[in-house]
């Protein structure tokens, strides 16, 4: 039995050996006692698992996390004769006064409770240099705290003496709830630290809090997915920084805020170098990130121009070089200061959020009422070292909705379904006028996005003709500026709906596109064959930036996402286009760090070298992607799979005990990415059994799923 203390998390990895004759499944019980006292109690542990498995781990009540951290109990599969590990968080119970000195026990049992082996070791650590913030009465604004405040009081509450079952570190928390149209007052926790620290945050499961340091330009939303889970926010120098606490916003207004504790771990030069070293290497790949101010503003109250800089700071931190900022979709109201198209000023709607099928908000209209979106995005992107492109969705008029634009209302005969028809000369002239407008505002580059709505194009030559007109406009402006105006095109890859109408080879040959971004639409065709596109741009000035989808139906980060990136880099692409990048960069902090890897092929390769080395050490497990915002798996989604602890080999899928699909290797998913698999999960409840080859046997796990 051996152990090591992680210098960043200050948690222990404890390793032990499972007896060679152990059955397929064994129960592991972990406990700790103050050194030499024999006062055993459950240890707060989780299995040693990959970041991808941790991401896909089901939340309560389906998940196992609560059992792990409250009972110290977990299951290991097909582990006979192998060394397995648990990660033990000693805080706070086993870390009095910042020091750990305890006995740690691992007991291995059969499922029936027969003890197969018991291992013990002593754990010691001096963590007195770690700073824990959880006495929230110390904030600089005591007037903003109250005991049992009403919502309309707009006060925070520092709650203490909460029951042990609440799973809060010291039985205390900071909690606040304000009226939906007004925020809670910000709180400041004073600090006087020097040097680099790693900062972790712990909240109640599925609660959130807004945090920033006093030197930051933006607030990050953070929250634990599981009880007692510490989330790595960031690492940075803490000289002259205080911590600022805010409640977050949603499309419906301001939400509640909850915080258990914040942990700050000092970092040695060696540890800091290791953390930063994962991003090292030549920046040999271009990273383009799609940013949709509409979606960002859906959950923000944007009333000041400077607010537009806040999300772009995160994009720059993520290493994005080309910012593709959407201004609107042709035929709909636009999200910028247009005097040609009608702006979106009022109430609008969005994609489903949780159980709300059609969420509405006034926030996006508010952004248009008080700010100039296009000018702000262009200006701040350039200030932050990015190359901005003004992006338009090729067309979706959203007929009979608040988003429908004037051109659609006045000329329904120019539509095909919900899209404008590119074969209509007046439509092309209208579209070109909007591009001329954003170029006059100052866009250094422009882009057009035919995904998710390619129906506006009737045939390839229609689009080729339009792109020649667009190229002529861009070149005219470029000559006047003395600098070329690049054109970026996102379009359906082979197999995607209407892909045959997009003649990318002609675009490259005639110089109509500077960036070629073949793409999936929704959950299908994420792993399209890149070879024809590599061949098309060979010897040209056009850069190939295939799309890797950043939305929930795309490959999950980090593992499946970086698997596709590595595959594309090996094929010789010039870089990656992430749609929607804001879903990753402005969401989870760990995703923003994954994005930082993309600009360096060597950084991505190094990530895989490390993952391949750790894979045999992980606890064996099979993990599936959850539903999206709507319950059940829909035809436009795919159930995707990740495995830990075994080599990536054959996998079989049994739906209600019938073999329905087999993969010889990754990418793992139920069915194919073609339309033929849209109905592979029929409507209603099902039992899904997945078998993954593990040496000379099979690792099996069963899941209860629903088809939408």
Language-model regions, residue ranges each:
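Active-site-adjacent "subsite" loops/lids of carbohydrate-active enzymes
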Residues: 278-305, 347-379, 389-441, 559-563
